[in-house]
Regions:
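N-terminal ligand-binding/catalytic initiation module
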Residues: 2-167
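Glycine-rich phosphate/diphosphate-binding loop of Rossmann-like nucleotide-binding domains
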Residues: 87, 92-112, 164, 170, ...
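Acidic, His- and aromatic-enriched active-site or binding-groove loops in soluble protein domains
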Residues: 173
């Protein structure tokens, strides 16, 4: 299998073997941890670890907000998945999702200089995932949920937003929705159409599709002009097959 056809505005061309080589050459994977402070002398080591580290420990114990001053917390995001909806590949398990999560982490670093770590949670139980992230949540400044299938992704995101005091962002919902809404608003502007009277069909009722329509309603699309379809057809109030909620 190869990817794309090349040329300007088209996806780069590469073979499966080239993709595997990219991920395996040198140090395997796409992430590493580097020190942000010098580690050249015994004094440096004493400040970074024992006994010097006790000073910020005590400061944070007295006031947890100091973690933003003395640790990586404020610029540290956790990219979290259970691998149940990996790209267009489906449910392939938590570990198989690791290359994607590493990829998202390097995008954070490359384009926003935000540090992050990937966490693959080996569970399909929403309550287990919620509890896992809740217990670890104080470590980071934000949560990026990714490649978790619907409808569990909605449950997980909503509960974590209620439980944690840091931003929780589900990439497949909100990232896709923001880009789609921006593109549509620009298209309407170029074609001189009114957002309130434009009719739109969304083909796909997963996390991304539902989030797209929710945001489009928020920016002015009339609910009666939005049609959402899944593999069984148009979604409507009273439909009994499938497990997708109606949002229109």
């Amino acid at each position: 299998m190869s990817n794309g056809t090349g040329g300007r505005g088209q996806r780069p061309v590469f073979t499966d073997q080239e993709a595997l080589l990219f991920h395996s050459q040198g140090r395997p994977g796409k992430l590493e941890v580097i020190a942000t402070k010098p580690m050249a002398t015994q004094r440096d080591l004493s400040l970074a670890y024992s006994p010097g580290v006790a000073v910020p420990v005590l400061a944070i114990a007295e006031d947890e907000s100091k973690a933003f001053d003395y640790t990586t917390k404020g610029n540290f995001v956790a990219v979290i998945t259970n691998g149940t909806a990996i790209l267009g590949l489906g449910n392939l398990g938590a570990l198989a999702a690791k290359p994607v999560m590493e990829g998202k982490a390097v995008l954070f670093k490359r384009f926003a200089d935000i540090d992050s770590i990937d966490l693959e949670v080996n569970s399909e139980d929403p309550d287990e995932i919620i509890n896992c992230v809740k217990l670890l949540g104080k470590s980071w400044g934000g949560i990026n949920l990714e490649d978790i299938k619907a409808p569990e992704c909605f449950i997980i995101e909503q509960r974590l937003r209620e439980l944690l005091d840091i931003p929780v962002f589900h990439d497949d919902q909100h990232g896709t929705a923001i880009i789609a809404a921006a593109g549509l608003l620009n298209a309407l502007d170029l074609t001189e159409r009114d957002v309130k009277t434009t009719r739109l069909v969304c083909n796909g009722a997963g996390a991304a599709g539902i989030a797209c329509l929710e945001l489009l309603k928020a920016v002015g699309f009339a609910p009666e002009n939005l049609i959402l379809c899944d593999t069984k057809g148009v979604i409507y109030q009273g439909r009994t097959d499938g497990d997708r909620k109606s949002v229109v």
